[in-house]
């Protein structure tokens, strides 16, 4: 018997036994340890399947994962004509699927549910001996594996929720698009950028729901839910010094490596000017109450006066908040010299900058030149991404997010935020499409910040709460025939 058939039969039996309609569950009743319901079991299986497919940006195969998820969608009942798997390279295919709405274009443009299925490379020897990055493990209330947090949880949830919606017979009013994509982490943009340039009609949307935001809990207490509505822009610069070189037995003052080192030291000490946007201002204002007293006071002070020296000292000392206040530039790669007994003729360093949305790459380049103050050091723009304007916080999207957050976690604030890292939302924002980073996946930054790193993990409870949150949000934004709370 297929999963869908068995689940439908079970639902029918349950309906016969329960003459009343159940109202929305709060988060405490969504997940019971060791007692997964059928929808959660399916989500776990899809999650496991995705994590155990190596989709590393250089050593893995993203197409394998896209094909596997396309197979799942066929099993859920999505017609072949509404499933697209494709990309510019054999190992870099994307999956785009469409759930047809009852009103089609009359209901407006589609809702796009976006997740990337490529991951940062991971080596077994870099992880704890008990874990393999491409083996799905559960231990002490956490799921472990590369991509568990970034971003295969959302991908698995989107696929699993299709089964639930199909079983219920739910039909959206507007079309719902699911896109699982390649090359978000790095690479020559075989994912969202390629889709928008080559198959724009497949991913055109009214709104985009993507990664970038999530809830925060600390010591078991749920604090707030965040919505990523802006992000800094990634640009790489090359610092380059050339020299005629010579024999190392006759050193000179004009050494290319030494000259570059001096420039790097200046860049390392420099702090870019402080900026506050409407989004970061609201973030600090609303987050202040949830932080330790000293940080909270600094957040309130910086909102009142962005030049407050005491507040700047406190916030700049915290790497998380320092990056939200200003453009940041850091050296990430270094090379120089060609022989152990020769003076270097070339020395280069890569400077990775995360640029505040109100600044340009050219402005940052000019700042670096001014700070280095050495015409012998070239500052070259190596690679840059398109500007990413902030998403307007529309009531028709934010109101359901607030409502569902309150249903599940009570009276906690929903706080807009700016991501210091990059997401694929930037491609849609550049085209004027509102993109919201929201997941309902809660974590404790003090212990769970492991994406891209050793022993990446996702709290088990958070995964199933996120599954429920995104299920309700999808129905609300796509036009549910019944109230979101009527499940």
Cite the ranges covered by each PLM segment:
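Bacterial N-terminal signal peptides that target proteins for export
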Residues: 1-14
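N-terminal signal peptide c-region/cleavage motif recognized by signal peptidases
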Residues: 19-24
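Metal-dependent amide/peptide-bond hydrolase catalytic core
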Residues: 25-27, 214-223, 227-230, 234-465, ...
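Acidic/His- and Gly-rich active-site-bordering loop/insert found
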Residues: 26-148, 165-174, 351
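Stable alpha-helical elements in mature extracytoplasmic
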Residues: 39-47, 61-65, 69, 154, ...
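Solvent-exposed loop/turn segments at secondary-structure junctions
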Residues: 56-58, 90, 102-104, 117-121, ...
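Loop/turn elements at helix/coil->beta-strand transitions in domains of secreted/extracellular proteins
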Residues: 76-81, 107-111, 172-176, 203-206, ...
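Acidic/histidine-rich catalytic neighborhood of metal-dependent amide-processing enzymes
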Residues: 142-143, 147-226
